[in-house]
From Swiss-Prot:
UniProt-annotated location(s): Endoplasmic reticulum membrane
Protein name as annotated: Protein OS-9 homolog
Organism: Neurospora crassa (strain ATCC 24698 / 74-OR23-1A / CBS 708.71 / DSM 1257 / FGSC 987)
Major localization class: endoplasmic reticulum
Start-end of Basic and acidic residues biased regions: 556-568, 579-590
């Protein structure tokens, strides 16, 4: 188990030696952290008697060993324990480099420190690193000469490896533009059209193409600067391509080639130019263009990743610098505590194994459902306790809540107030249609058997025997707009039927000429004290009524439905008993 080394790096009083600085600057290197250390909390433990024995031997300071009833008998010798700790630290820190030293340096010996982290204590072994040998002037000059020879050798070897790209072309697509680069020739920018055969992108003959750069033929020069003509075979072996060099960045070398002679730029009046960089990428099986960018006006940069350069160790990516391990082991005072430690470790291992088995089972189940026997190797990324990208279904506790208006509609629907939910939602969305006379009555906007008298909405409140019935129509599009569905309307029919009414007479659905289904019903928008529905100022009351004979009293069905609206007075105040009288009803005031 690895943890940050903030607490233990305070041991700066130890005689650490300075390590060799890197050859070139890298933004990933901490220039002030040399040598580098990493704190590792081991899964093993050490008995208290052995821990103090190691501290005494390392510091050469006599310390009394505390006596404890359940202390270990000390049968393990100090030499064996020291060797075991050193071997474990080395194995945990460096398993890939074999015999190579960590960070380019080797530890001379180890010292021990006691770290108190209540209620636990740890014995930490800290390696002491040998300082690098001092370089004199002669050794520095020899090192520079050796480095220059290595650069020349890598430069020639690199271009020799890149000759395998001759007579090959690479393609790259970036948005509108496509690029074609033929090694040793030129790179062309053009707009591509789909290739029906599935091959490289085809050039659009109706658009213009641009040459970003052209390669010059390789040539060899005499000492006087005069060009010497040689056969092509010898020419390829003598010199690399012109306008090339070897560069290094982040401790990795790569080849650079500059091409000139491109299409004249309209903005600068000069030919287009491009710089090509060849980087070693051992993870690829073939050559590939990484990206192309226009760094300045009509000046481009292209990066090619190729495994060819990886054949030379000089172009390989730098190995990750590993820190020296500071290994800490928990101090145990008794055999009972050791048993408890081992049990906790076993439980941790079992829990991890069970979690891995559960993931494997889930992957197999998903693979069988999709018809693919492949298992998922990617376990996803856990963010705030939620696995992302691993085909996991979120539990209900992590599902985002519905918007407030949808929550209210769902609650009202679940409580059985379907009519109230429908009317409230309809008036909020302003989707109710107001359709004039009914076939059974000459009065506009009224239920044919609504009762004794009628009056306009908002004309008064609490007046008995006066009702305002509105014929409401909702289309399929309005249903979708309200967030309702056919199941909601079916439940509404059941509510009307439970109230002793006929849903086919109170909630009718018909298909219009355009093929759209429309639901229509009647609602009371005035209120009646006799029915227990009082129309307060600024309020509307909705009541279901059953058709009756002329002169009969309307029978209230279900609970009175209320809806808030803007306050307003109806303009039509004529008597509802007068046949043929027309009442005006303003929808904008609702």
């Amino acid at each position: 188990m690895r943890r940050p080394s903030l607490a233990l790096l305070a041991l700066s009083s130890l005689p650490f030696g300075s390590a060799r600085q890197p050859a070139s600057f890298s933004i990933h290197q901490d220039l002030l952290a040399h040598p580098q250390f990493e704190v590792i909390f081991s899964d093993s433990y050490v008995f208290e008697a052995d821990a103090f024995a190691l501290l005494e031997a390392a510091n050469k300071t006599p310390k009394p060993t505390p006596a404890s009833d359940g202390a270990h008998d000390g049968s393990t010798t100090r030499t064996d324990l020291t060797s075991a700790i050193r071997e474990s630290a080395t194995a945990n820190a460096d398993t890939d480099n074999g015999d190579e030293s960590i960070g380019g340096t080797s530890p001379l010996r180890e010292t021990y420190e006691l770290i108190a982290h209540p209620p636990m204590r740890y014995l930490c072994s800290i390696p002491i690193i040998a300082p690098p040998p001092a370089l004199n002037k002669t050794a520095t000059e020899l090192a520079k000469a050796e480095e220059a020879r290595e650069v020349t050798r890598a430069y020639n070897k690199g271009w020799e490896l890149m000759r395998g790209l001759e007579n090959q072309c690479l393609h790259f697509v970036s948005g509108w533009w496509s690029y074609q680069y033929c090694y040793g020739k030129s790179i062309v920018q053009y707009h591509a059209v789909p290739n029906p055969k599935g091959g490289p992108p085809l050039r659009d003959k109706n658009s213009q193409e641009y040459i970003l750069g052209t390669s010059l033929p390789p040539s060899s020069h005499s000492q006087k600067g005069k060009q010497i003509e040689v056969p092509n075979n010898e020419q390829k072996q003598l010199s690399p391509p012109p306008n090339t060099e070897l560069q290094a960045k982040d401790n990795q070398r790569y080849l650079v080639q500059r091409l000139d002679g491109g299409t004249i730029c309209d903005l600068t009046g000069r030919p287009r130019t491009i710089e090509i960089q060849y980087h070693c990428n051992p993870a690829l099986s073939g050559d590939r263009i990484g990206w192309i960018k226009e760094v300045t006006t009509c000046a481009y940069l292209m990066v090619i990743h190729t495994p060819r350069l990886c054949a030379d160790v000089a172009f390989l990516p730098p190995k990750e610098t590993k820190a020296h391990p500071i290994t800490c082991r928990q101090i145990i005072t008794s055999d009972e505590e050791a048993l408890s430690f081992n049990q906790r470790r076993k439980n941790t291992i079992d829990s991890a194994a069970a979690a891995a088995a559960a993931v494997t089972t889930e992957d197999q189940k998903q693979g069988s459902e999709s018809g693919s026997p492949e298992k998922l190797s990617y376990q996803g990324l856990t963010v705030a306790g939620i696995p992302i990208g691993a085909r996991r279904i979120l539990p209900s506790t992590h599902v985002l809540p519905l918007p407030r208006h949808l929550q209210q509609q769902r609650q009202e629907a679940q409580q059985g107030n379907l009519l109230e939910a429908l009317t409230k939602a309809a008036f909020k969305a302003d989707v109710f249609g107001d359709y004039g006379d009914d076939n059974n009555n000459n009065n506009n906007n009224h239920h044919p058997k609504a009762g004794k008298g009628r009056k306009a909405a908002g004309a008064g409140k609490g007046q008995s025997g006066q009702k305002e019935m509105k014929k409401m129509r909702i289309s399929e599009r309005d249903i979708d707009k309200l967030g309702l569905d056919q199941q909601t309307l079916d439940a509404l029919r059941e509510e009307i039927r439970a109230a002793g009414l006929d849903p086919d007479r109170n909630l009718n659905d018909e298909r219009e000429a355009g093929g759209e289904i429309v639901w229509e019903f009647y609602a009371d928008v005035s209120g009646d004290e006799d029915d227990g529905a009082v129309a307060e100022e600024g309020k509307e009351v909705f009541v279901w009524y059953e058709d009756e004979d002329e002169g009969g009293e309307p029978a209230e069905a279900g609970k009175d439905q209320k809806e808030s609206k803007k306050g307003g007075n109806g303009e039509g105040s004529g008597s509802g008993s007068e046949e043929g009288s027309k009442e005006e009803y303003y929808r904008d005031e609702l």
